[in-house]
Regions:
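Intracellular helix-loop hinge segments at the cytoplasmic ends of transmembrane helices
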Residues: 19, 98-109
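C-terminal transmembrane helical hairpin of 12-TM major facilitator-type secondary transporters
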Residues: 57-101
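Helix-loop boundary and gating motifs at the non-cytosolic
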Residues: 1-32
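Conserved glycine-rich helix-kink/hinge and helix-boundary motifs of the Major Facilitator Superfamily
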Residues: 1, 30, 61, 116-120
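Transmembrane alpha-helical cores of Major Facilitator Superfamily
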Residues: 4, 34, 38, 120-128
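A late C-terminal transmembrane helix in Major Facilitator Superfamily
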Residues: 109-143
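Helix-to-loop junctions at the C-terminal end of transmembrane segments
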Residues: 42-56, 141-142
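Multi-pass alpha-helical transporter architecture, strongest
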Residues: 102, 150-175
């Protein structure tokens, strides 16, 4: 579930920021894409470094809280350089989250004999849900007529997917 939610969120950011919002701000798409990839990779490396000293739950809470804050700020600010900085911060956090989700997925399927089938199924479901979520995102944007509303939608989305769902699952696992 976490993997699917992350994939849907990543596609939203990739499509709406990298293509539509970049055009409105006047940045070069190649430059932004390169910075985006560097931030994503740096986030993954950073996760590998800090995961040895901090617990997974603490990293998730800090990361998700920071991401929600960056989304909300992105929806309220107008300075294009601050928006670019926030975008790169979001991508750095997404890179950290990617490493964390990979680690969590590996823990979840450790010892399973049909790992490839499980991963393929999750990937297939993720692609379908990504398509559905992009359709919903498009509809929301058409209703409100402003891209900035999508940053608030993203903040709520990531709050639900990365905080509420894992906390509910954790409570169920305790029982």
């Amino acid at each position: 579930m976490l993997n699917v939610g992350y994939d849907c969120g990543t596609q939203f950011i990739l499509i709406y920021w990298s293509i539509i919002y970049v055009e409105k701000l006047g940045f070069n798409l190649s430059l932004v894409y390169t910075l985006f990839m560097c931030a994503l990779i740096l986030g993954s490396v950073l996760f590998n470094k800090i995961s040895t000293s901090l617990n997974s739950k603490g990293i998730t809470l800090l990361n998700t809280g920071s991401m929600i804050g960056a989304f909300v700020l992105s929806g309220t600010l107008k300075n294009k350089y601050l928006l670019l900085f926030l975008f790169l911060l979001i991508e750095l956090l997404m890179g950290m989250m990617s490493g964390q989700i990979s680690a969590t997925s590996n823990e979840a399927i450790y010892g399973e004999s049909n790992k490839s089938t499980m991963l393929s199924t999750v990937s297939f479901i993720a692609e379908i849900l990504v398509s559905v979520s992009l359709f919903i995102s498009n509809s929301i944007m058409e209703i409100f007529g402003d891209l900035k509303v999508m940053f608030f939608v993203s903040a709520v989305y990531f709050g639900v997917v990365l905080l509420i769902i894992p906390l509910i699952k954790e409570k169920q696992d305790v029982r």
